[in-house]
């Protein structure tokens, strides 16, 4: 029977980055950190900390977090807290333990001094309380009690975060501000997660993370994972799919398995690695002396079953009939994360899972349902599910995005099934239409929209995100795991404040808003198009003219990146030296490297165009390209040398001049040429062309009227999509509405002359998560009947054959999808355009209207009327 994860009353969930509070506000909240003496419990007084008490019989994970907390106190106050295993209180102290497993805490509960009714039996719940008179002669004590071992961990790290220790203190070198006095206010607070399993997938880790780990730790080993597990737990995550490119977590370092369990982590294996077995193990002689044979369940069933049994036996090798805590992946894909044969029947996959569950039951000695399991509906496996594949009720069904951040399918039935549902999401990917592995290209607004929808539709049991090398995707990882802890708290206001709060935690209050703005703008710009998809042909470059060049779309992107980099440099100049290593990693390098890449391709495009025209200005752009190519290497070298080379090798992904979906072998500069007979000091300038009168652009957020209903309302969400703001209906997850329901937005437009109009409605791309044949909206002009428009993008992991697959590929390449609608015979003047909601998961970004003038029908013209009366009454 699983521990309950139902919501317990929460007095004050203060301890997350998204809700990071001001000191004044925190001092008014119960059981909260305060840096002013408000008669609270002094955690640190004049640099001296309270001792920490932990039970001698405590779980190793609880002892480890007590030790980590002692070090965190030292980071803040300068002195490490003493750790005691005393079974009674003789002075004020910090008591860390698990309900029912800690003598001191249990006695406080029995004496009525600590009410734990809100967390008892709740999955990973914790309570932080200042207890008065906990023992004779002791005025007060700070109790951190977990309903289970991870509850105790999360409660302890919650305090660490609020006293100023960032979860990224090691993985991004975020410094800790020194405090001589730290107090905990009176009272009690509780918190617990809304999503059961919350984790990351380390993937596509060659050459970056692998090369870095080899230099830093001697390999992807327990020393590296100890740092990574610490980060995940501080971010209130509990789950990981470990690195798997040629790696085997349980074999590569004998210490890995026990380390994960001793730190409180839940181990898993990726979507195509069943029964706790890494894919690499199948081909290792130590596990398969005969080499394993073909990964084909129809022809090699006996060997595969032996292999799987070995995985479950290893999971149960902890002793005393207890497993190393795991979430067991079931199911099967082809060898090397490929689809199984095209004629694979649904019945075979059902048989695979049936046999796997029989092995689980046999090895554990318990019904299979008592071992947590997950079946990933990834790529073609989702198709089998759509066609009726039967899945045991206790197995968590893990839906997936399309590898580009668009969730493919969500629950439509049995939402309350025992195993529940989850989502596998991507911040990194290797596959069509192009790999993206180099840098952070995540817009957290899009993550919020897709995961908020997923949660609303019932995906509440597992959220796991592919993070590639982990760096440099720190900010989106922080957001994803914070949201996973409590999606209900991550409303649009919390979303908009998130970047500023992350910056405040990382760099202090002074520059928080400026850095937050840089992070938001970067996320929006970078998400528009993956850098691996950029080249000199990506955007229209403009036209050759004199004395100034006529700018095209490429110039607009170049300018906004240059402005962002200039703004970053201004903030950098105000950054304190102790914050600079973190600033470089989290802010400067991402912005400078992407700005540099855009400038390089922009210059390469103009060089090519001007050389073809024999224009000497080509030489200016040739120099720019060469400068940019050198700067890219210099930025990489600086990243690898900062903090005495701590991150050497981490930013080694090839990211220039892709030709196919897969990455090139090495960095190459775009081809440039010179006009040798020309001067090299020619000035270059640009002029932008105004929007023609025949074109009007309206931001989706600039509606003149929003018609809601009692259950849903239109909401503007900044930094969602590429426009001023994305406009969505909240709450998400509701069923269809009709045109008669009039859940709509109204826009005003001006037709410059009589004629026709072509409307282009730009949307943030989304997928039909119901498999109902597409997503619909309706549009109407003035009082004319509404027309329904729809789109149905079909994600594919291979070649795009159908129109729907080709449309999907273009949508993820450009990070937008457009619908077109033609309207005939509009009179000159003002008109009202109405956009109606029909289906969920629509994000409106922008409206573009192109007008085409034509002759007004004679019967309606003034000339026609005059001629009619002339004929009727006669004229000379």
Positions of PLM-derived features:
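Bacterial N-terminal signal peptides
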Residues: 11-21
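C-terminal non-catalytic alpha-helical accessory regions
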Residues: 176-179, 499-655, 743-745
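Structured mid-domain segments that build the active-site/substrate or prosthetic-cofactor binding neighborhood
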Residues: 233, 238-241, 247, 399-405, ...
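Extracytoplasmic
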Residues: 663-876
């Amino acid at each position: 029977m699983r521990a309950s994860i139902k919501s317990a009353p929460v007095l004050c969930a203060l301890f997350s980055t998204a809700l990071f509070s001001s000191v004044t506000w925190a001092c008014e909240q119960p059981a909260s950190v305060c840096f002013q003496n408000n008669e609270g419990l002094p955690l640190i007084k004049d640099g001296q900390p309270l001792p920490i008490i932990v039970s001698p019989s405590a779980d190793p994970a609880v002892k480890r977090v007590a030790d980590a907390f002692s070090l965190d106190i030292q980071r803040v106050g300068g002195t490490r807290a003493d750790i005691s295993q005393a079974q009674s209180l003789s002075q004020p102290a910090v008591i860390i333990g698990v309900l029912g497993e800690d003598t001191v805490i249990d006695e406080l509960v029995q004496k009525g001094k600590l009410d734990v009714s809100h967390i008892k039996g709740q999955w990973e719940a914790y309570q932080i309380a200042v207890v008065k008179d906990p023992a004779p002669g002791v005025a007060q004590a700070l109790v951190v009690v977990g309903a289970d071992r991870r509850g105790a961990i999360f409660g302890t790290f919650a305090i660490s975060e609020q006293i100023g220790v960032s979860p990224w203190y090691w993985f991004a070198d975020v410094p800790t501000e020194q405090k001589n006095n730290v107090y905990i206010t009176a009272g009690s607070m509780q918190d617990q997660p809304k999503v059961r399993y919350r984790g990351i997938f380390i993937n596509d880790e060659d050459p970056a993370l692998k090369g870095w780990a080899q230099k830093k730790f001697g390999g992807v080993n327990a020393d590296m994972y100890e740092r990574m597990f610490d980060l995940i737990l501080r971010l209130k995550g509990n789950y990981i799919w470990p690195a798997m490119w040629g790696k085997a977590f349980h074999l590569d370092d004998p210490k890995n398995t026990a380390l994960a369990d001793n730190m409180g982590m839940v181990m898993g294996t990726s979507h195509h690695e069943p029964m706790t077995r890494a894919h690499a193990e199948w081909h290792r002689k130590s596990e398969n002396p005969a080499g394993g044979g073909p990964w084909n369940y129809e022809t090699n069933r006996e060997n595969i079953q032996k292999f799987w049994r070995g995985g479950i036996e290893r999971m149960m090798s902890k002793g005393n009939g207890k497993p190393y805590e795991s979430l067991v992946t079931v199911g099967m894909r082809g060898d090397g994360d490929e689809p199984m044969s095209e004629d694979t029947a649904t019945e075979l996959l059902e048989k695979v899972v049936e046999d796997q569950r029989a092995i689980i039951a046999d090895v554990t000695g318990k019904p299979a349902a008592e071992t947590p399991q997950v079946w990933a509906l990834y790529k073609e496996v989702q198709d089998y599910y759509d066609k009726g594949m039967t899945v045991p009720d206790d197995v968590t069904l893990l839906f997936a995005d399309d590898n580009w951040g668009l969730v493919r399918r969500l629950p439509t039935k049995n939402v309350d099934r025992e195993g529940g549902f989850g989502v596998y999401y991507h911040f990194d990917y290797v596959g069509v239409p192009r790999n993206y592995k180099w840098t952070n290209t995540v817009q957290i607004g899009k993550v919020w929209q897709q995961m908020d929808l997923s949660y609303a539709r019932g995906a509440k049991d597992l959220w796991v995100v592919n993070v590639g090398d982990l760096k440099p995707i720190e900010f989106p990882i922080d957001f994803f795991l914070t949201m996973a802890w409590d999606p209900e708290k991550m409303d649009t206001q919390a979303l908009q404040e998130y970047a500023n709060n992350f910056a405040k935690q990382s760099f202090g209050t002074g520059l928080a808003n400026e850095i937050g703005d840089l992070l938001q703008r970067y996320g929006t710009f970078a998400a528009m198009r993956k850098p691996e998809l950029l080249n000199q042909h990506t955007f229209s470059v403009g036209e050759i003219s004199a004395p100034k060049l006529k700018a095209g779309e490429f110039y607009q992107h170049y300018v906004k990146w240059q402005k962002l980099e200039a703004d970053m440099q201004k903030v950098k100049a105000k950054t304190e030296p102790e914050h600079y290593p973190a600033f470089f990693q989290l802010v400067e390098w991402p912005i400078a490297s992407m700005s540099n890449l855009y400038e390089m391709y922009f210059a390469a495009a103009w060089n090519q165009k001007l050389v073809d025209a024999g224009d000497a200005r080509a030489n200016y752009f040739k120099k720019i390209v060469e400068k940019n190519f050198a700067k890219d290497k210099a930025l990489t070298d600086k990243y690898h040398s900062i903090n005495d080379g701590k991150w050497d090798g981490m930013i080694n992904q090839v990211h220039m001049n892709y030709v196919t979906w897969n990455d090139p072998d090495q960095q190459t500069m775009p081809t440039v040429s010179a006009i040798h007979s020309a001067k090299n000091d020619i000035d270059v300038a640009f002029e932008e062309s105004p929007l023609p009168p025949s074109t009007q652009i309206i931001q989706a957020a600039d509606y003149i009227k929003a018609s809601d209903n009692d259950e849903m309302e239109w909401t503007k969400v900044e930094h969602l999509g590429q426009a001023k703001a994305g406009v969505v209906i909240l709450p998400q997850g509701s069923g269809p509405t009709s045109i008669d329901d009039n859940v709509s937005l109204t826009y005003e437009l001006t037709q410059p002359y009589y004629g026709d109009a072509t409307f282009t409605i730009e949307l943030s791309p989304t997928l039909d998560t119901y498999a109902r044949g597409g997503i619909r909206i309706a549009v109407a002009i003035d009082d004319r009947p509404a027309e329904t428009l729809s789109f149905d993008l079909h994600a594919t992991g291979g070649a795009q054959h159908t129109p729907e697959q080709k449309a999907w590929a273009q949508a993820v390449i450009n990070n937008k999808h457009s619908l077109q609608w033609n309207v005939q015979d509009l009179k000159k003047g003002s008109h009202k355009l109405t956009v109606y909601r029909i289906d969920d998961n629509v994000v409106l970004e922008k409206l573009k209207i192109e007008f085409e003038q034509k002759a007004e029908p004679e019967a309606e013209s003034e000339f026609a009327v005059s001629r009619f009366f002339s004929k009727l009454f006669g004229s000379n």
